[in-house]
UniProtKB/Swiss-Prot annotation:
Reaction(s) the record says it catalyses: orotidine 5'-phosphate + diphosphate = orotate + 5-phospho-alpha-D-ribose 1-diphosphate
Binding positions (orotate): 132, 160
NCBIfam families: pyrE
One Pfam family here: Pribosyltran
Keyword terms of this UniProt record: Glycosyltransferase, Magnesium, Pyrimidine biosynthesis, Transferase
Pathway assignment: Pyrimidine metabolism; UMP biosynthesis via de novo pathway; UMP from orotate: step 1/2
Subunit structure: Homodimer.
Listed name of the protein: Orotate phosphoribosyltransferase
Keyword Oxidoreductase on entry: no
Domain of life, source organism: Bacteria
The protein's Enzyme Commission number: 2.4.2.10
């Protein structure tokens, strides 16, 4: 399937499985009359594959060492993208950032790394399923920067176009999206 056909097919899947109308309160606290819940698309075999392939194709030539983001939305994305990257012969390792470090066990804020593995100095792309203001992704960025990571890009599946670009620009971060909310409205 061509890139444009894959993109059109994924848009259909997101529209059917993950887009809805009706008043909701977003993670940002804002009210909206439409919403995206990408989890049904991320858990669908075709949807997960298309999300991973299209994201991998958008990122493969940029030299990222790791891909990940804030739990929960980034977990299935990062895992699927890492798998596709291995299959395509250009592996990008995955991780995720906990909203709050575990209070037991290793008490980690960043999961997916071995004990002797570090993100310090590594080129990182932070991925997110849906971005509104950018606040959730910035939590991951802050944790990663504290760990010494070089966060080089924030990449979202759907940008609601409600301030995220400005948030990331103010933090000196490039921001890209697979889709814009207006494509579904």
């Amino acid at each position: 399937m061509s890139k444009s056909a894959s993109r059109a097919r994924l848009l259909e899947i997101i529209r059917r499985r993950s887009f809805g109308r009706g008043e909701v309160t977003l993670a940002s606290g804002r009210k909206s009359d439409f919403y995206f819940n990408l989890k049904p698309t991320m858990m669908d075999p075709e949807g997960a594959t298309l999300l991973a392939e299209l994201t991998y194709e958008a990122l493969k030539d940029e030299g990222f060492d790791y891909i990940g983001g804030l739990e929960m939305g980034a977990v299935p994305l990062a895992g699927a993208i890492a798998q596709i990257s291995w299959i395509k012969g250009h592996p990008i390792a995955a991780f995720f950032v906990r909203k709050k470090p575990k209070e037991h066990g290793a008490k980690l804020a960043i999961e997916g790394l071995t004990r002797d593995e570090t993100l310090a100095g590594k080129r990182i792309v932070v991925v997110e399923d849906v971005t509104t203001t950018g606040g959730s992704a910035m939590k991951a960025v802050e944790t990663l920067r504290e760990a010494g990571a070089n966060v080089s890009l924030v990449f979202t599946m759907v940008d609601r176009e409600e301030g995220a670009a400005e948030t990331f620009a103010a933090a000196g971060l490039p921001f890209r999206a697979l889709y814009k909310a207006r494509e579904f409205l």
